[in-house]
């Protein structure tokens, strides 16, 4: 295995601690605890009382996440009939992508990736010797996803179709009609879909998820960052 340099981190890291205003990162300034209580409506005294009785005993706990947290995560997919048992808590979105790609792809499979995309989506599969096919979004086509090109990139050996929505880094968003078409293409080839939805929910209107369409091989990845 030979992993490529992670370009965005190589570019960001040298200046990250020096910049007064960082326009190259997706993270926002963290709340103070006072701000967090005001935004959530949580009673501060009740929260602190819970903390007093919380055990600090170290144990592995629930390997895939606490039932309470998983139920909360399932709640952000109201149209997808997502249940807590469908949710896996992991160490960040990058870790989730790695688990899916490394866990699903085997020799003889191919991996179809819509690009531009987050670099790990295509470089991890390349690094383990998986044929990685790129469907390139084009500026002259307003970065619209050509469904015919996506279908043409797939065949009987396509195990996984990967995309970001909203797109990272260009911000183009696919809505219900386009996502439904992607699901139908995946069904045609019995392929999994990995949709990195890190920026889903950036506005007040409901933004559809790849898991809204009842396809059991659709995987949504998200994170707090």
Regions found by a protein language model. Give the residues of each.
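Active-site phosphate-binding strand-loop segment of PLP-dependent enzymes
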Residues: 139-204
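N-terminal small-domain helix-loop-helix segment of the aminotransferase-like
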Residues: 2-92
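Conserved active-site segment immediately N-terminal to the catalytic lysine
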Residues: 206-225
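Generic structural signal for small/hydrophobic residues in well-ordered secondary structure
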Residues: 23-26, 73, 87, 111, ...
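Short strand-turn motif at the edge of the Rossmann-like AdoMet-binding core
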Residues: 116, 197-199, 224
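Short beta->alpha connector loops at strand-helix junctions that form conserved
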Residues: 115, 131-140
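Conserved PLP-anchoring active-site segment centered on the Schiff-base-forming lysine
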Residues: 85, 103-125
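A short helix->loop->beta-strand "cap" motif at the edges of active sites that frequently abuts
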Residues: 109, 130, 188-191, 215-216
